[in-house]
Amino acid sequence: MDQLIQLVEATQSRTDFPVINPGDTVRIQLKVIEGEKERLQAYEGVVISDRGAGASKTITVRKISHGVGVERIIPVNSPNVESVTVLKHGKARRAKLFYLRKRTGKAALKVKERKFPVKA
């Protein structure tokens, strides 16, 4: 059974996805279908969490939009994810940055920048 799961995950997993850690600021291009039209929508924010592994891996991205915090859980292997760009590598001492939810203003997105990014 484990071999079957590994085989399916190997065929379904994306290889063009960059290394993303909590604290990184990312821009994700998502496919949005409105009626018959399909367009790309950019979603930019701080990665506050990553879960799972393989085909079921997800990341939680948080941004502040018009003074309101917005979080989105994005499946890494979703066909609706067109591309992911890492804008800044953040330095975080926690695996989950849920404490950013309590902060307001600029402090809500403030994470120290990592001088030397982690290599894959």
UniProtKB/Swiss-Prot annotation:
<dbReference type="InterPro" id="IPR018257">
    <property type="entry name" value="Ribosomal_bL19_CS"/>
</dbReference>
<protein>
    <recommendedName>
        <fullName>Large ribosomal subunit protein bL19</fullName>
    </recommendedName>
</protein>
<keyword id="KW-0689">Ribosomal protein</keyword>
<dbReference type="InterPro" id="IPR008991">
    <property type="entry name" value="Translation_prot_SH3-like_sf"/>
</dbReference>
<dbReference type="Pfam" id="PF01245">
    <property type="entry name" value="Ribosomal_L19"/>
</dbReference>
<dbReference type="GO" id="GO:0006412">
    <property type="term" value="P:translation"/>
</dbReference>
<keyword id="KW-0687">Ribonucleoprotein</keyword>
<comment type="function">
    <text>This protein is located at the 30S-50S ribosomal subunit interface and may play a role in the structure and function of the aminoacyl-tRNA binding site.</text>
</comment>
<dbReference type="InterPro" id="IPR038657">
    <property type="entry name" value="Ribosomal_bL19_sf"/>
</dbReference>
<dbReference type="GO" id="GO:0022625">
    <property type="term" value="C:cytosolic large ribosomal subunit"/>
</dbReference>
<comment type="similarity">
    <text>Belongs to the bacterial ribosomal protein bL19 family.</text>
</comment>
<dbReference type="GO" id="GO:0003735">
    <property type="term" value="F:structural constituent of ribosome"/>
</dbReference>
<dbReference type="InterPro" id="IPR001857">
    <property type="entry name" value="Ribosomal_bL19"/>
</dbReference>
